[in-house]
């Protein structure tokens, strides 16, 4: 009778398990493929010739060398080694790699060792020493591909973490490059202001001498002194901005403000010319786009993993134990105990929990798919923005240069007319201010062009080779 009951229970268990395995709720998502997006073959605002390329991998490069500035190259090398944001991203990558190794370990059986020692007895009796040693082996075969899906998902997470590392690196390099050129343009502005200050000081001295000699009005002296003070105030403001930019560059280098100093440098900087053929491969080489695609792949694997919740769990176990009474049974053979077993578990009813988890995974996949498309569109926009600015700055450069030449000539003409007694010194001051404003605007435009070049390269993924 008891044997019949056991058989009936076993048959019922098998039936329920098979019912769970064949449930129509178990869905099998299609194999993951990278979404194909419809993109243009050219950029709307491209002045250069652009070509579309095939898939390539993100690789480390030294894109800043296009500026041909040895100090900038040295700073970028320091940044790559000491930047703390980059170190954080590297640590996150190592964490993702460790999680992948953890998932691979789930394919293998686990081995546990256990032991115990006991010393017992009663009053007037011989103490009893007992030692026990055992081993336990368990293994969960990957019948439904759960471990494989988990590994697939974590591999995608690792790839996303690697892309995130590349994105952080590129962003920090861009920040360092932009800050460096901000400082260099401020150096040039300080040089212009210093030369202007010396010129204005000479004018004040000459006008004072003329005023003392009765050859000039006091109003001319006051106007010249006011103009000199304005330039000195601009020097203070410009120096303050340079100090703040230097502080930013110090942090990017992984140093304290006190540990870092960038000497002033008077130099002529030229906006680099990009290669005539630049591929429109930012869709596949931009780190943020790669990260979004890999996150989508990880979510797809998570969706497949959620589907396996309808399938039963199966585990195989083997245990062995050595039991010996060391003192009281010293000359007797120890006792060996062993057992092996097969265990299966199937969840029949959970109140809709598994359906909800699958729905959540599907919604998450939809979200990541939209995020991937958004990353691609954002990439295109950033390139188009940089191209618009590049073209506009180039047109503005020629006009600005003409304006500076006119302002310089006007200053020279008005100065000669003042020396000839034909105009007041107020006109000289006006002409000098126009020349100074034009020269400063020319430098600021150079600054915008240098930063735009770096931004365009970064928008293309940091690789223009």
Give the predicted meaning of each segment.
Residues 344, 361, 368, 390-393, ...:
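Hydrophobic, well-ordered secondary-structure elements that form the walls
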Residues 75, 82, 89, 140, ...:
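Amphipathic alpha-helical coiled-coil segments and their boundaries
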Residues 211-215, 418-422, 459-463:
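A short glycine-centered flexible hinge/capping loop motif at secondary-structure junctions
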Residues 62, 68-71, 75-78, 87-90, ...:
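Small/polar-residue-enriched beta-strand and adjacent coil segments characteristic
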Residues 85-90, 94-100, 104, 193, ...:
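Long, contiguous alpha-helical "rod/stalk" segments
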Residues 147, 163-278, 389, 413, ...:
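Periplasmic alpha-helical coiled-coil/stalk elements that build and connect Gram-negative outer-membrane
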Residues 98, 105, 163, 170, ...:
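Regular, well-ordered alpha-helical segments
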Residues 3-81, 239-284, 326, 458-465:
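Terminal intrinsically disordered/low-complexity segments used for targeting and assembly
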